[in-house]
């Protein structure tokens, strides 16, 4: 007799855990500044997962890699290949840590939105979600990428780097300048839009048909989350390579 009420309560609990609220934020007041606490908390969790996993996997490195060490060596080799392909064989080395950090942080952040029950942690306002579910995170990552490719170009070419803005003709100066503004915009909004849309679709499906239909969508979300991390890292490496090679 009590099976139906129990099932309904269970489904309601699952829906609450899976929910995503948009537009509500929780802030810390530090001095005269408001700090976006939600993004900081979830970002710290992601960083802790990355550092903890790396520390456990390589705490006792072996000449013949074990499972954890072998996995991280494979990830490093993958990141090196991406960097080498986009930046160039002679220049890619110093940029592997930056590209790798971007890829791993975005990848784990995206997956945390699907796998970690952030809703369990209650906040006075808003709720926790994947760091990349917030436009502040994606804009910050895109601006870091912009700083990186400007730095790469200026380091390689000096002030001659700015000559690319008048190539192949000075008439294209406004378009070439605008291109540098659209790069971070496209990077940030592509990542933010895809991750937010993925989580909202899962929430809607859970509310309509709990337990069954959302599962394949969640697996698809994990796949697309990984692809988005790869796209962001690949484009960041491509922009850095382009800034050192010249205008294309």
Curated annotation (Swiss-Prot):
| Database matches in InterPro entries | ATP_syn_F0_a_bact/chloroplast (IPR045082), ATP_synth_F0_asu (IPR000568), ATP_synth_F0_asu_AS (IPR023011), F0_ATP_A_sf (IPR035908)
Organism superkingdom = Eukaryota
Origin species, per record, is: Nuphar advena
Q: What is its main location?
A: plastid
Q: Which Pfam families match?
A: ATP-synt_A
Q: Which HAMAP family match?
A: ATP_synth_a_bact
As for family, the record states: Belongs to the ATPase A chain family.
Q: Does the keyword Membrane apply?
A: yes
* Gene3D superfamilies given in the database record: ATP synthase, F0 complex, subunit A
Protein name, entry field: ATP synthase subunit a, chloroplastic
Read off the lineage from the record: Eukaryota, Viridiplantae, Streptophyta, Embryophyta, Tracheophyta
Keywords annotated in UniProt: ATP synthesis, CF(0), Chloroplast, Hydrogen ion transport, Ion transport, Membrane, Plastid, Thylakoid, Transmembrane, Transmembrane helix, Transport
Per the record, membrane topology reads: Multi-pass membrane protein
Chain segments annotated as transmembrane: 38-58, 96-116, 135-155, 200-220, 221-241
Q: Which GO terms describe its molecular function?
A: proton-transporting ATP synthase activity, rotational mechanism
Name which cysteines form disulfide bonds. none
Localization in the cell: Plastid, Chloroplast thylakoid membrane
* Listed GO CC annotations: chloroplast thylakoid membrane; plasma membrane; proton-transporting ATP synthase complex
Any coiled-coil regions, as ranges: none
Q: What's this protein's function?
A: Key component of the proton channel; it plays a direct role in the translocation of protons across the membrane.
NCBIfam families tied to this protein:
ATP_synt_6_or_A (TIGR01131)
* Assembly information from the UniProt record: F-type ATPases have 2 components, CF(1) - the catalytic core - and CF(0) - the membrane proton channel. CF(1) has five subunits: alpha(3), beta(3), gamma(1), delta(1), epsilon(1). CF(0) has four main subunits: a, b, b' and c.
């Amino acid at each position: 007799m009590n099976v139906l009420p129990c099932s309904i309560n269970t489904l309601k609990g699952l829906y609450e855990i899976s929910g995503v609220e948009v537009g509500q934020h929780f802030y810390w007041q530090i001095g005269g500044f408001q700090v976006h606490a939600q993004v900081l908390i979830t970002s710290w969790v992601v960083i802790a997962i990355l550092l903890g996993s790396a520390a456990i996997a390589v705490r006792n490195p072996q000449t013949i890699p074990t499972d954890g060490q072998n996995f991280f060596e494979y990830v490093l080799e993958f990141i090196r290949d991406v960097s080498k392909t986009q930046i160039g064989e002679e220049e890619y080395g110093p940029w592997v840590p930056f590209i790798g950090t971007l890829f791993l942080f975005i990848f784990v952040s995206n997956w945390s939105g699907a796998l970690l029950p952030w809703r369990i942690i209650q906040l006075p306002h808003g709720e926790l979600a994947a760091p990349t579910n917030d436009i502040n995170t994606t804009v910050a990552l895109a601006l870091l990428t912009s700083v990186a490719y400007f730095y790469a170009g200026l380091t390689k070419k000096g002030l001659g780097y700015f000559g690319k803005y008048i190539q192949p003709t000075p008439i294209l100066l406004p378009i070439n300048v605008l291109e540098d503004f659209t790069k971070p915009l496209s990077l940030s909004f592509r990542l933010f839009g895809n991750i937010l849309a993925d989580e909202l679709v899962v929430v809607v499906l859970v509310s309509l048909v709990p337990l069954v239909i959302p599962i394949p969508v969640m697996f698809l979300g994990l796949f697309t989350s990984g692809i988005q991390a790869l796209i962001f890292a690949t484009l960041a490496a491509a922009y850095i390579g382009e800034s050192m090679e010249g205008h294309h």
